[in-house]
Structures are given as C-alpha cells and as structure tokens.
Amino acid sequence: MAKFSKVLVALDGSQPSIKAAGLGIVIAKRSNNPQVTAIHVIHSSIPIATLVTPSTIDTMVNRAKQEAEKWLNEVRRTADQNGVRLKIEFIVNPASIVAAIVDHAQNHYIDLIVIGSRGLSGFKKLLLGSTALGVLTYASCPVLVVK
C-alpha cells in the first residue's frame, strides 16, 4: 500500500468531513514524516450587487473562523493523539470551492486529498455532494471520499 505523508483534508464542519479528518490523520500516521493540512474554505454568500465595506467582510470572516474553531479543536486533538503535525489553513472567498481545494493540493504537492461525501448543503438524498464530486473529477492526486 502506498504511503501518503502529505495529506490534505477539506473541512466544512459536517460529520462526514470530521470523520474524513480523522481518517486522513490515521493514514498520514503510517508514513515516516506525517503532515496533514486541514483547509476550511470560507465562501460568503454576499450577492455581487451588494455594497459591503472591507470591515464588514472582515467581521464575517472572523465570525466564520470562530465558528470553525469549535470543530477544529476536535481535529487538533485527534492529530495530537496520533503524533501527526497538523496545519490549519483558511481560504477566503475563492471563485470556486472545488478549485480552491484542487489548486491547494497541486500547489503544495499533496499525496492524498480526504474529503467528506456530503457537506452542510442540506441535500441529504444525494449520494455524493457537489464539492466532493468536483474534487474527484479535477484533482490530479488520489482522493478518498468518506461517508
């Protein structure tokens, strides 16, 4: 079995993404130099025509980061318990969430992307969420989708 030392986990706070983080950490632990990067993409839903000040955007981003810290602490504990280095990054307002994940993986020479099967969108009947499907389609490295 291939050893994946550089693992990227895409997190949105959903249960599948938290499970994906745990599995990504365990997989990375099997390598000699485990390194997991957890990314959370903050995508605001501000309509383009809305006039928003930079301070309003900063406030929204800070709130999103504070909310994410609640579930990121669980991921940090899992990494610490497994002796795996964890780096947490936030990507703010990309044109595409899928492109942000795929580009990050490519730019940082990631060995494996681990992502939850469905996010927080609420489409529970879908077998695979649109973000997971997009990452599977466009990533140049292996992708593990966790249910």
Give the residues covered by each predicted segment.
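Structural beta-alpha unit
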Residues: 2, 77-113
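Small/aliphatic-rich secondary-structure junction motif
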Residues: 2-55, 82
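Short alpha-helical
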Residues: 15, 96, 122
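General small-molecule cofactor/ligand-binding pocket signal
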Residues: 37-39, 87-91, 144
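A short acidic, glycine-rich active-site loop
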Residues: 56-70
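Gly/Ser-rich helix-loop-strand patches that form or flank binding pockets
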Residues: 106-147
